[in-house]
Amino acid sequence: MHKLPANPKRGQSQGEEISNSISHGIGLVAALVGTPFLIMHAVRQGDAGFIVGTSVFSASVILLYLASTLYHAWPIGKAKRCFRIIEHSAIFILIAGTYTPLTLGILRGAFGWTLFGVIWGLAIAGVALKAFYKTAHPILSTCLYLLMGWLLVIAVKPLFARMPTAGLFLLSAGGLSYTAGVAFFATDSRVPYGHLIWHLFVIAGTTCHYFLVLWYAA
């Protein structure tokens, strides 16, 4: 596993790290509270695709917010570097986890399973990139995040046919929120509290997709 600098980029100030940790700590609590409602709703539907999809989505959300909270709360050192790798890897898992209820619960069939396989293959590649390669560049990782997120455009036609307008709005709003936040993620070394702003966009995107899954994919 490659070594990351103890104080990446310019480093976040103590105040920034506190706000970063609190923001995603709140997101973690919300995810833990919201998950039972999501799972119970899927179970009531009695559909295996919905149950698996919502379970994977929920687990990926909890993992991301837990990893992020621990990373930003931990003091500089070896453990913090490890949490940073886990946090960045969890972004790939969250993206794939968000696809899962859509591919298994809504799209289904050969197309749904193919997209499911492709997106999880990319997620595994992204995790390996973060964990094992010294040459892993943040720009490459960010581009892969965006590629995975917007790969869903190939499914626009079947989604239009199987999802109401409100569901498509939530799907798009969540994707646009994540994408807009990437600008602050990429420039947080130059923008004070830019990483906090990124976190707020992530929370907004997750919220949109939570209600998308609750109302239309479970």
Please identify what each model-predicted range represents:
Residues 1-218:
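Multi-pass alpha-helical transmembrane bundles in non-GPCR membrane proteins
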